[in-house]
């Protein structure tokens, strides 16, 4: 049991470090002022890939590290609270929805084994990316002092 909790702690820590590191160091280079909207957000793709290669018993519990890690990352970037809350929700929903759809389609443990699975992966991540971006943009438009995105 101790070995399992250690691996859960290691996976959760890895998720938090990657989210904070990539978001703070790489992602701001793709943001457009003044809203902080980004056309390319590498953090979510990297984290989704990490979650997919984790053991299935740990994957869902390690995903609980996403919201706190995004809050810390957004604070380090310097976003206001309204933006921080909206981006945290949008990014977390995007990844959790993709994981749920992968498990619903039955492709979470071996997503690239067949052409059908590959197409489901591409459709799922495209859909989740669009929904996450839309949710983030709507948050900025409604909560931020800058309402230039809509």
Go through each PLM region and give its residues:
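Short helix-perturbing small/polar motifs within transmembrane alpha-helices
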Residues: 1-39, 45-148
């Amino acid at each position: 049991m101790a070995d399992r909790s250690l691996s859960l702690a290691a996976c959760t820590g890895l998720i938090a470090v990657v989210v904070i590191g990539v978001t703070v160091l790489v992602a701001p280079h793709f943001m457009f002022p003044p809203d902080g909207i980004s056309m390319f957000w590498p953090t979510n793709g990297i984290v989704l890939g990490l979650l997919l290669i984790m053991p299935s018993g740990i994957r869902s519990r390690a995903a609980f590290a996403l919201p706190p890690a995004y809050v810390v990352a957004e604070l380090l970037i310097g976003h206001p609270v309204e933006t921080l809350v909206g981006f945290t929700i949008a990014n977390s929903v995007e990844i959790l929805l993709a994981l749920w759809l992968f498990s619903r389609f039955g492709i979470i443990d071996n997503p690239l084994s067949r052409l059908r699975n590959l197409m489901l992966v591409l459709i799922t991540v495209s859909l989740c990316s669009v929904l996450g971006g839309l949710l983030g943009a709507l948050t900025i438009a409604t909560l931020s002092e800058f309402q230039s995105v809509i």
